Amino acid sequence: MSTTTKIIQTTDIPKIKGGLPFLGHMIPFAKNPFIFMKKVSDQAGEVAQFKIFNQRMILLTGNDASKLFYRSSDEQLDQSAAYKLMTPIFGKGIVFDAPIQKKNEQLKMLMPALRMNAMRQHSGKIITEVEDMISDWGDSGEINLVEAMKQLTINTATHCLLGKEFRYELTNEFSDIYRDLEKGVNAIAYSFPNLPIPSFRKRDKARVRLHELVHKIIEKREASNDKHTDMFQMLIDTRYKDGTQLSSNDIAGMLVAAIFAGHHTSSGTSAWVLLELLKNPFHMKEVTQELDSLLGSDGNVTFQNLRETPKLENTLKEVLRLHPPLIVLMRQVAEDLLFKNHQIKKGDMVWASPPVTHRMAHLFRNPEVFDPDRYTPGREEDKNLMAYQPFGGGKHKCSGNAFAMFQIKSIYSILLRKYTFEFVDTPDTYVDDYGEMIVQPKSPCRIRYKRRTADTFISKYGTAGDQQEASSQCPAAPSTKAQPATTTTEATTNPTFYISIDKQLCQGHAMCAGESPELFNVSNNVATATVASPSVSMLEKAQCAANHCPNAAIKITTDHSSK
């Protein structure tokens, strides 16, 4: 009996012309990474190859190619090998420098501070930081918006995530340390992270100093009887699965990783929210009216009532589509892959580019137009998770995405009710600065502000925030106890629905368990449905949980076959 082997004919991946000996396409990439990759995608399509130094790069853009990038396993596409530039920042053996299992274990340690219950506690801290920032603004004036947002978001991130020592005792020094670390992420670092250049020397000195500070704080806390509930203390108390305690170097690296997750995606985005609203007065009016109606002139801002701001949220989503903070995401190919008869070889570096995919007309209608309504019911252009990817995708999606969204919404729930704003310079001068790998608007980014008066409010509820906290919650379930799985008899008289959870997307934010503890449980950073087929009376609660999942990992269906 003979057997036959099917031979798959492969075709070459389209090559980008040009490039210099040894350097390849490094010069145009370093000059403007976004423009370079947009041209690559426009010329070659969803998969293209080029070289940076002697490394073959494969750019994957669009829906299908992005699915390969975000859905492949770690055994196929190695995230850690692609991010060696982060080792001098996080430290040896931390996150991307750790074996896969240890890296995943470390990232799970950070999740409790980014979950729903923690964020309920964060709201007051964020509001305090915003009010501190504007306390000396007076009735009118001018600011550099980019610098103001950089300082505000580092203050909120340290206050919420690191603890009082970093926020109140080391404020200026930690800000300087963080900025030196952040400047170590640039185009050169992707290929040569250890070159003896000034920015890398500053980065390395900052990392050493951070370790020293962390070690001193640990010693101080161990000698004190004070009780701490912040992420810092959580890491001090946490153990690896084998019982090993985290070293001070481990903790320093983990804290920086947490700040990168909760800050670097939000400072530039925070600035762009205001800039885009100023460029689009109609949407500015809608967002301001929404906040006025919900909170009045002095209503309290809470985690719950900020969920009732769809216009602000859709504005933020659209800002993230047009101005995603990361230009490129990377993986190293660990085993040969086939994509539409194109062979991607072991050792290749594959890239995804959110800003390029976000501007594809077949994925987003009129992609260059600022249009927050594209996320409203009936359009929902963010539902395709392989197209809308400001925080990445798959199981490696940025775990700080929910915190970043909440942080920015909190900031503008205060600023837009306190002041009106206007450009100092002509609107077309406010553009992205692609000279950095973490995108910000170009500086100086000058904005003029003026305090609002009571007669400018659309509605005045006073302390409406307190009233809204209760009324804006998802509808209560008929019972606070978990329901048993529906029996066949019940299904006949009481229709059911089905819950499925994409384990690759779920990161354990626990929004679902917070909204519907009757239906969901989170253990070991993975959510599970506690009821196999709930009665339809629980459908509204389940849909609420699905709507608030930051990773869109929950699917509600009425057809068991599609579960």
Predicted features and spans:
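Cytochrome P450 catalytic-domain helical core, especially the substrate-recognition surface
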Residues: 13-38, 42, 56, 83-162, ...
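Central I-helix of cytochrome P450 enzymes
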Residues: 153, 157, 210-217, 238-293, ...
